[in-house]
């Protein structure tokens, strides 16, 4: 079982933990992924000035562990930019604020109330629960998800401005399904 630990870094809150987090998970042999603080799920009082960008995190890590080397993407739609230390330890960076990846996103999410969201930031969900209630089988669900995915036009991260974004909170499971 491959384990990856995701951690969100927020300026003036936990950025002082970047080195200890890296050290701890390096010692455990567990990959860590640093996530830029995002305005996801209607996060209240999100402020872009609180974002610690991936480049900044890499600079901090380099002061203790040496220069990081970028790694090639393993598969299309991979959300983490992977880097390695000179000893081969891999660190991931999910940089949806500074380096949006909307065009290559392959992630969909299903909420607790059975709605499919084609973007983590989306306020608009598609009702899959009703399909199931009406007797849809797995092929029907698959076809519905594929059709919804093909017509998606979500580009929230690419279109985000530096102004605070007003959204309605959506309770979304962070377990994702991969749409192919």
Put a short name on every predicted segment.
Residues 147-174:
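Charged phosphate-binding loop/patch that engages nucleotide di/tri-phosphates or the phosphate backbone
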Residues 175-180:
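Conserved small/polar residues in nucleotide/adenosyl-binding loops
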Residues 41-157:
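Accessory C-terminal segments flanking Radical SAM cores
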């Amino acid at each position: 079982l491959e384990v990856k630990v995701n951690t969100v870094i927020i300026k003036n809150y936990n950025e002082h933990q970047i080195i200890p987090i890296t050290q701890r998970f390096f010692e455990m042999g567990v990959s860590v992924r640093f996530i830029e603080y995002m305005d996801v799920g209607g996060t209240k009082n999100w402020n872009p000035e609180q974002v610690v960008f991936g480049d900044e995190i890499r600079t901090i890590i380099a002061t203790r562990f040496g220069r990081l080397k970028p790694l090639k993407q393993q598969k299309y739609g991979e959300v983490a930019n992977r880097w390695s230390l000179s000893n081969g330890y891999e660190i991931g960076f999910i940089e949806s604020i500074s380096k949006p990846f909307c065009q290559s996103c392959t992630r969909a999410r299903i909420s607790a109330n059975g709605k499919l969201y084609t973007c983590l930031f989306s306020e608009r969900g598609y009702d899959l629960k009703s399909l199931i209630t009406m007797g849809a089988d797995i092929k029907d669900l698959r076809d519905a998800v594929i059709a919804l995915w093909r017509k998606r036009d979500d580009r929230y991260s690419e279109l985000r401005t530096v102004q605070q974004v007003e959204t309605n909170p959506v309770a979304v499971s962070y377990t994702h399904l991969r749409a192919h």
